[in-house]
Amino acid sequence: AYTIFHYGVSAWGGYLAIGLPVAYFAYRYDAPFRVSTALYPVVGADGLDGVLARGVDTAAVIATIGGVATGLGFIATQLLAGITFETGRAFGNAETVLAITGITTFFTVSLIAGVSKGIRRVSQFNIGLMTLLWLVALLGGPTLLLLNTGVAALGTYGGNFLDMSLFTGASGGASWSVAWTVFYWSWWIAWAPFVGLFLARISRGRTI
């Protein structure tokens, strides 16, 4: 349930908080594709080139760098941890840096290729790979247990969403909340400018 909670509606709510206003004002009022465009009703068209808007865009860039750096670190360490689990070979900092460099190079090439040729194809490949892994795990593992656990987790998540969202650990367990929920939400907030702009960019022709 907490996995769904940490990666589910709460995370996408942050992305949409930026993506929706940017998409609306960019396509309806011909505003630029910047995070500061969400401030269009407050600062107006002329204010998008002002100090406040520039400050918001600068903060968005810094947050994006932090979010991407954290994601790359997690991906690299999880990849190497999986290899260690299968082979028993341990990896150090040098291998982690090499893995991060390789992943960064791969995604940089996909970005340079553009949305239709690069990112779209990588996304389609990821969806196919995810579907394959899901089918292998579902059909090759304890199928009924996985289905029952998934349904139960959705029920727990739906029934306790408010409690989970507002839990601060005031009477105990604060360290867990900080290490998990607060950490993940901070991570998603850092990703929000990047993902929000991406959603805005691909939303042309779609209604809110």
Regions found by a protein language model. Give the residues of each.
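Transmembrane-helix bundle segments that line or gate the permeation/cavity pathway
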Residues: 1-85, 109, 138-149
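Acidic, glycine-rich loop-and-beta core segments that form the ion-binding/anion-interacting portion
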Residues: 114-168
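Membrane-interface interhelical loops and short amphipathic "cap" helices
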Residues: 1, 75-91, 145-178
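Hydrophobic cores of alpha-helical transmembrane segments in multi-pass integral membrane proteins
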Residues: 9-24, 66-70, 126-137, 184-199, ...
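Glycine- and acidic
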Residues: 60-68, 115-117, 177-181
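Transmembrane alpha-helical segments of multi-pass small-molecule transport proteins
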Residues: 89-115, 132, 185-197
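Hydrophobic, small-residue-rich membrane helices and short re-entrant helix-turn-helix hairpins
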Residues: 34-51, 111-130, 150, 195-208
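Hydrophobic alpha-helical transmembrane segments
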Residues: 2-20, 56, 96-101, 168-192
